[in-house]
A protein has these predicted regions:
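Conserved, well-ordered alpha-helix/loop/beta-strand core segments that scaffold catalytic motifs
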Residues: 82-122, 130
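Small/polar-residue-rich segments within soluble enzyme cores
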Residues: 1-95, 407
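Short beta-strands and strand-coil junctions in structured, solvent-facing domains, enriched
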Residues: 108, 413-414
């Protein structure tokens, strides 16, 4: 208004003052049609109250009951006087504020990388390894916060925040199984891969039934050998794997704010794993096991940070309407792994990117560590083709890790093809901006 530009206001009769020459319009926030972090922020109803996300969690802090008043000169009959100056005034906007841990530059880089990587259904999340702060989280598809009704009939679940939702994860869970083995002194375990193996009468194949030959833990991670991890799982036993998974945070929800809670996922029970075939499936992240992208990122933080992680958090501080600020910090790290296991796994996952099937994730100017995954879902399209969740999760730089990044795509081809290049683009963008 101060720029002299025309503004169209949609008002109802209840919003017109009883004083005939004053028009009162409530002050509402309005988001751009391409708002970053839309699933985190949420959207408002027609009265300006938050319905989802941060807007709902902190509605009592963010809602404004202020109004803009337009005084319009009128004659004795209530008709506006042509050419008269309109006087615009507004009430003091009495609202608080919520400061998130999101870094806008990183968030924008993630949003762009997802779209550039053609991830139409999926997500990406970036976590600061030092303290667990969520620096970026983007989900696809998005919805328009100003025209929510346009997306209500969509079959692709545009309102679902995939960063906090659980999915079949596949081979990226091999990182947790490898951690369980290292914690128990099995880093020297080897086996012969012939492209497939039979356990409990069920045949499990490696990708394209490739025979990897004699494989140790480092090589098994590089080529993502199912046969190796199936045999390793049988040697470890179900309890060892589930105990390590629990230490890394799998099967546990995380509350970021009131109503913003990540799904706990599903860790199979001891009863569900009491057959060799069920344990074999679990050993490479298949079967009933599910986890959220934020849980995968949390696991990678532990690997990168000497075996410790801080639970991911999203809200840095809240200032209420009286001006009182409350800050939130992560001061209590969880010790999940030994420093020695962390060091060895970091070296192995760096080799996955340098020499293995994660090479398409390699950043331009520094090293990274990570793991691919292509997870079967048991869901088929109309042509009978199984839809897979594809993943890449990693951290960088390998020698002094700062960020953990996880990308997931629904209906993808492979983690190496779909998600690893997106990781590389995000890592390069963050390095350039800093």
């Amino acid at each position: 208004m101060s720029d002299g530009l025309p503004v169209m206001l949609n008002i109802g009769k209840r919003e017109i003052s009883s004083d005939s020459d004053i028009l009162c319009v409530p002050i509402y926030r309005r988001y751009s049609d391409s708002q970053p972090a839309q699933h985190l922020l949420g959207y408002l109803d027609e009265t300006g109250h938050g319905l989802t996300g941060i807007e709902k969690a902190f509605d009592s802090v963010l809602f404004s009951d202020g109004e803009v008043k337009a005084r319009v000169p009128a004659d004795a009959y209530g008709r506006t006087i042509s050419g008269s100056e309109i006087e615009i005034t507004s009430d003091p906007v009495n609202i608080g504020s919520v400061r998130l841990t999101i870094d806008l530059d990183i968030q924008n880089a993630v949003e762009y990388a997802l779209d550039n990587g053609k991830i139409s259904e999926g997500c990406a999340i970036v976590i600061d390894i030092e303290d667990g702060a969520v620096r970026a989280a983007a989900s696809r598809p998005v919805y328009n916060a100003n025209r929510v009704s346009d997306s209500l009939s969509s079959s692709s679940a545009p309102f679902l925040n995939r960063c906090f939702s659980s999915f079949a994860v596949g081979s990226i869970f091999k990182v947790a199984v490898a951690a369980a083995a290292l914690e128990r002194g099995l880093d020297g375990f080897e086996c012969e891969c012939k492209g497939s193996c039979s356990v409990g009468g069920v045949v499990f194949g490696c990708s394209s039934n490739t025979a990897h030959g004699k494989v140790d833990l480092k090589k098994a991670l590089e080529v993502s050998c199912n046969t190796y991890f199936i045999n390793l799982g049988q040697k470890l036993g179900a309890d060892a794997i589930t105990e390590t998974a629990a230490l890394l945070g799998f099967g546990q929800k995380n509350e970021f704010a009131d109503g913003i809670i990540s799904e706990p996922g599903t860790v199979p029970t001891a009863e569900a794993l009491n057959t060799p075939a069920a344990l074999a499936n679990f050993s490479f992240g298949q079967g009933s096991f599910t986890a959220s992208p934020v849980q995968i990122a949390q696991m990678l933080c532990a690997v990168a940070n000497s075996g410790k992680y801080n639970r991911p958090y999203l809200v840095a501080s809240v200032t209420d309407k009286s001006g009182k600020e409350t800050s939130y910090e992560n001061k209590y790290p969880v010790v999940a792994l030994s420093e020695e296991t962390s060091r060895k796994l970091t070296e192995m996952l760096t080799s996955v990117v340098e020499n293995g099937n994660g090479s398409s994730a390699k950043p331009k100017d520094f090293s990274a560590a990570g793991k691919t995954a292509t997870a079967q879902t048991g869901i088929f399209d109309k042509n009978g083709v199984e839809l897979c969740n594809t993943w890449f999760g990693g951290f960088f730089p390998s020698d002094n890790p700062k960020y953990a990044v996880v990308i997931m795509k629904q209906g993808g081809s492979s983690g190496a093809e779909d998600c690893a290049p997106v990781f590389r683009q995000i890592a390069d963008s963050i390095n350039f901006s800093e």
